[in-house]
């Protein structure tokens, strides 16, 4: 496959990094430093304006995908429109799929949408996708990550095991999980473990659990402490991410939301839109304000300002003052491990949402949903099995599935099944798989 990426910032760089090992990748950026960094990858780098028709004409022939992910919405949209016009006027050229990263809510009102009428096959808003991800996590206060698959029939939730947890020292088989619910993987420092019943649970393990949403309702009592009151949430920053997240939380009956926003005019605007939230004009680093709002009683503090450094400081203060759980936005990929190293419960990145959507388009026809976890070290992938899929029609114990991958769930009609060795996958089944990043390309071969 040939992919053209416009923009070599955080998002563009990581898309190129993910695609370059097995694809022809061209990356365009007018910033000299960004282009120089991209040149470290096995890609063709062009220094210039990615919306320029002359440059696009040179690289679009035989391209399967064009991804415009600069920091300017209009440049991304114009690049996609220009690409479509060029292809329309070139006889015999394939119709390249176009993707644009867009942040302005005037252009987009959902995380992913199509604007084919203006030449954009897929429009992705990383900020809205991030807000949706955080809202899913907030539905389970003890979780550090969450995702839905198979149109809501399967849920993935990731939990961190604290040193004080009653689970430390127990065997996997001692976990009292509901039916149709399994531990898919354990992340332990640099290790990724597909667990067995006699494996011990250790402090600071990150455990990925997959199951029916209704079967996972009691996981709070297994992995954390079940909250008996309305979930108390403090949101710091109400920009694009914060506003969209606040709207999602505001609809929940079981949530008590407070917002700290430094801009007075923005506070007035937010207060007029939200029905149930308390909006405070102030600074998330103001210790007196945090104490006045009884931050030690907060179940979750979410810092989503536009500054990574401010989010880090707000999060550290919240932790120090007794907040039970802290989630922070980190746009820079090199900051993600730093946030968790200093004790922040979870660092979330708008970049990952865009990378996930692009990878889903490039990895094969059968993919329905794909999400990366633990800093792109592993993936949860949902495939739809076709008549030609190698996995169809034989017992799973006869299928030599790649090492480092595990079939977690199969959705067949209204049924959600944990497959055993004698289970046979049928055409049309939706198969949810945990895979280490190194095994993902091998997994794909079973569904072609």
UniProtKB/Swiss-Prot annotation:
Query: What GO MF annotations does this protein's record show?
Result: potassium ion transmembrane transporter activity
- Which Pfam families does this chain map to? TrkA_C, TrkA_N
Q: Which residues form the RCK N-terminal domain?
A: 1-124, 230-348
Residues noted as binding NAD(+) 2 in the record, renumbered to the chain: 232-262
- Keyword hit for Secreted: no
Is Repeat one of the keywords UniProt gives this record? Answer: yes
Binding positions (NAD(+) 1)? 7-11, 29, 70-71, 101
Q: Which GO terms describe its cellular component?
A: plasma membrane
Q: Where is the RCK C-terminal domain?
A: 144-225, 368-448
- PROSITE patterns xrefs: RCK_C, RCK_N
Tell me the InterPro entries matching this sequence: K_uptake_TrkA (IPR006036), NAD(P)-bd_dom_sf (IPR036291), RCK_C (IPR006037), RCK_C_sf (IPR036721), RCK_N (IPR003148), Trk_Ktr_HKT_K-transport (IPR050721)
For this UniProt record, give its keywords in alphabetical order, as a comma-separated list.
Ion transport, NAD, Potassium, Potassium transport, Repeat, Transport
> Domain annotation text?
The RCK N-terminal domain binds NAD and possibly other effectors. This is expected to cause a conformation change that regulates potassium transport.
Q: What does this protein do?
A: Part of a potassium transport system.
Q: What is this protein identified as?
A: Trk system potassium uptake protein TrkA homolog 1
């Amino acid at each position: 496959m040939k992919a053209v990426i416009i923009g070599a910032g955080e998002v563009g760089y990581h898309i190129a990094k993910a695609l370059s090992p097995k694809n022809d990748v061209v990356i365009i950026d007018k910033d000299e430093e960004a282009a120089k960094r991209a040149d470290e990858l096995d890609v063709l780098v062009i220094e210039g304006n990615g919306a320029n028709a002359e440059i696009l004409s040179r690289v679009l022939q035989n391209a399967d995908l064009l991804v415009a992910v600069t920091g300017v919405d209009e440049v991304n949209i114009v690049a996609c429109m220009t690409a479509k016009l060029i292809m329309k006027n070139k006889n015999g050229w394939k119709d390249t799929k176009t993707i644009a990263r867009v942040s302005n809510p005037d252009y987009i009102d959902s995380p992913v949408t199509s604007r084919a009428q203006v030449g954009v096959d897929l429009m992705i808003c990383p900020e809205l996708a991030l807000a949706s991800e955080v809202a899913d996590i907030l539905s389970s206060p003890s979780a550090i990550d969450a995702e839905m698959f198979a149109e809501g029939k399967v849920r993935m939730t990731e939990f961190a095991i604290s040193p004080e947890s009653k689970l430390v020292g127990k065997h996997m088989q001692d976990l009292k999980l509901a039916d149709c619910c399994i531990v898919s993987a354990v992340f332990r420092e640099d290790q990724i473990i597909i667990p067995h019943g006699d494996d011990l649970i250790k402090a600071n393990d990150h455990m990925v659990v997959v199951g029916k949403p209704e079967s996972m309702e009691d996981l709070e009592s297994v992995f954390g402490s079940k909250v008996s009151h309305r979930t108390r949430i403090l949101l710091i920053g109400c920009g694009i991410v914060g506003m969209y997240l606040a709207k999602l939380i505001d609809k929940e009956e079981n949530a008590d939301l407070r917002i700290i926003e430094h801009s007075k005019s923005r506070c007035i605007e937010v207060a007029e839109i939200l029905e149930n939230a308390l909006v405070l004009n102030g600074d998330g680093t103001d210790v007196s304000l945090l104490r006045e709002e009884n931050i030690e009683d907060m179940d979750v503090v979410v810092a989503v300002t536009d500054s990574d450094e401010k989010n880090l400081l707000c999060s550290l203060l919240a932790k120090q003052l007794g907040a039970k759980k802290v989630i922070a936005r980190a746009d820079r990929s090199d900051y993600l491990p730093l946030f968790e190293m200093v004790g922040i419960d979870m660092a979330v990145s708008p970049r990952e949402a865009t990378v996930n959507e692009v990878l889903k388009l490039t990895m094969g026809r059968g993919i329905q949903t794909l999400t990366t976890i633990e800093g792109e070290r592993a993936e949860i992938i949902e495939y739809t099995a076709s008549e030609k899929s190698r996995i169809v029609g034989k017992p799973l114990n006869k299928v030599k599935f790649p090492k480092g991958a595990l079939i977690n769930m199969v959705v067949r009609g209204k049924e959600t099944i944990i497959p055993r060795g004698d289970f046979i996958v049928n055409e049309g089944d939706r198969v949810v798989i945990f895979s280490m990043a190194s095994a993902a390309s091998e997994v794909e071969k079973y569904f072609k």
